[in-house]
């Protein structure tokens, strides 16, 4: 059935292959490392000569393919007939297309098998002939990564230890400050206790003194009592019964009551003194306690201030050390920069001196070349004068030449100031065996002039170098009738 003029697109899971034309099949495999081009007509593998399979990575492409669009180009005469045939015979068309698809799939499978065999062979050849480009550094990479991990862990551990050391130093500073505060407080308490002991000793001494005074007073009272009784007894014994005087007087004073009163007075005095002393002692103790509490509070405040000041001092010392290190680094950088720029300046100075020397040499060379150019211009003018002179001489001597066909040569020479050497040669050409009359027109004559230029370089009156250059020059003179 005729299927011209229709366009059919069929989806498949295999790569496309055109059965009627040349189509390149590109296969990609995840475990292969090369691309292989296979033509469907000849089934030949195209690889460059002298090159193996290169280990360049292959681009991965999904194994799902779309068969390309097949266009069947109809003839202009059969367009309507083809469209009618397709519309009327769809089943036959689909059957034909399915048969073609089956044959196409069989060819694709065959080509895939051949391509796989060729890839295996190429892989074997490449594995046999492929040189080792570079050693395997994977083990070293793993070792390097492990060492880098260890280095990072060590750095983290070092930073943690440094932070712990700093914290320990701060805690030690706090404990040292607390110890010093407690030590100063203990010293103050010991000083207060020593003062109180001294006060207690003074009070015990005053108490003992008062007790001694009371005892001495009681002893004195007893002595007075005994003396009084003795005096009374002695007076009674002296008087006896001789005098009996009745005296109406005031009743006698009871010494016991008086002594009792005195004792009560002294005891009250002692009690008042004791109370006064106790009150004074209590007031002193309260004042001392208040002073101790206030001093302890002030000391704690001072200790806190001291701790804060020490922390501030430590932070300032750290900052000062950092500033010192920064200053040292900046000084080193400045010194390096100065040294680098000094070296660069020296290089630039040397380059400037070299350029100045080159400029001076170029100027001297230009002056020398200018002088040589002037000399050469002078030589050129003289040579032109000489050439004109020789030309005039040749023209004047032309009438004197013989008429027979023979070759004559005339070589005049001239030397001017040992710098130029000219050798003109006059030649006239004639053929042997042919005689011409004198008045016949002959061939043109050629004059050979040799220009010898001697260049001498003179310095301080001495010839340094000398160069000689010989340049031939031909002058053509037309023949005269």
Swiss-Prot record:
Oligomer status and interactors: Heterotetramer of two type I and two type II keratins.
Region (Head): 1-90
Region (Linker 12) residue spans: 238-253
Pfam families, per database record: Filament
Name the record gives this protein: Keratin, type I cytoskeletal 39
PROSITE patterns: IF_ROD_1, IF_ROD_2
Organism: Rattus norvegicus
Keywords noted in UniProt: Coiled coil, Intermediate filament, Keratin
């Amino acid at each position: 059935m005729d299927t011209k003029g229709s366009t059919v697109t069929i989806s498949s899971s295999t790569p496309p292959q055109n059965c009627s034309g040349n189509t390149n099949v590109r296969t990609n495999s995840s475990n292969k490392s090369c691309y292989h081009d296979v033509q469907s007509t000849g089934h030949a593998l195209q690889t460059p000569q002298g090159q193996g399979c290169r280990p360049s990575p292959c681009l991965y492409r999904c194994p799902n393919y779309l068969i390309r669009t097949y266009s069947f180009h109809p003839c202009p005469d059969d367009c309507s007939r083809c469209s009618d045939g397709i519309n009327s015979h769809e089943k036959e068309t689909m059957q034909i297309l399915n048969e073609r698809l089956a044959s196409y799939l069989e060819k694709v499978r065959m080509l895939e098998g051949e391509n796989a065999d060729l890839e295996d062979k190429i892989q074997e050849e490449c594995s046999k002939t492929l040189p080792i480009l570079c050693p395997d550094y994977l083990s070293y990479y793993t070792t390097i990564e492990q060492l880098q991990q260890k280095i990072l862990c060590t750095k983290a551990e070092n930073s943690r230890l440094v932070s712990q050391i700093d914290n320990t130093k701060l805690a030690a500073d706090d404990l040292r400050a607390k110890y010093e505060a407690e030590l100063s407080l203990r010293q103050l308490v010991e000083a207060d206790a020593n003062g109180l002991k001294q006060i207690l000793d003074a009070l015990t001494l005053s108490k003992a003194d008062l007790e001694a005074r009371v005892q001495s007073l009681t002893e004195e009272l007893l002595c007075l009592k005994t003396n009084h009784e003795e005096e009374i007894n002695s007076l009674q014994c002296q008087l006896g019964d001789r005098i009996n005087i009745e005296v109406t007087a005031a009743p006698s004073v009871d010494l016991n009551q008086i002594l009792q009163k005195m004792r009560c007075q002294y005891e009250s005095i002692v009690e008042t003194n004791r109370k006064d002393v106790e009150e004074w002692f209590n007031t002193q103790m309260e004042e001392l306690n208040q002073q101790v509490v206030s001093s302890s509070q002030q000391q704690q405040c001072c200790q806190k201030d001291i701790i804060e000041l020490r922390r501030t001092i430590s932070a300032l010392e750290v900052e000062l050390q950092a500033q010192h290190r920064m200053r040292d680094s900046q000084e080193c950088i400045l010194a390096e920069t100065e040294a680098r720029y000094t070296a660069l300046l020296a290089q630039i100075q040397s380059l400037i001196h070299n350029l100045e020397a080159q400029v001076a040499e170029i100027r001297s060379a230009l002056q020398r070349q200018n002088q040589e150019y002037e000399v050469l211009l002078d030589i050129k003018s003289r040579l032109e004068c000489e050439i004109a002179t020789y030309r005039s001489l040749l023209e004047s001597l032309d009438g004197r030449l013989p008429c027979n066909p023979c070759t004559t040569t005339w070589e005049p020479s001239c030397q001017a100031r040992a710098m130029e050497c000219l050798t003109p040669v006059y030649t006239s050409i004639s053929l042997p065996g042919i005689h011409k009359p004198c008045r016949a027109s002959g061939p043109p004559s050629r004059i050979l002039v040799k220009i010898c230029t001697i260049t001498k370089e003179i310095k301080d009156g001495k010839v340094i170098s000398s160069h000689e250059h010989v340049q031939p020059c031909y002058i053509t003179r037309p023949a005269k009738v």
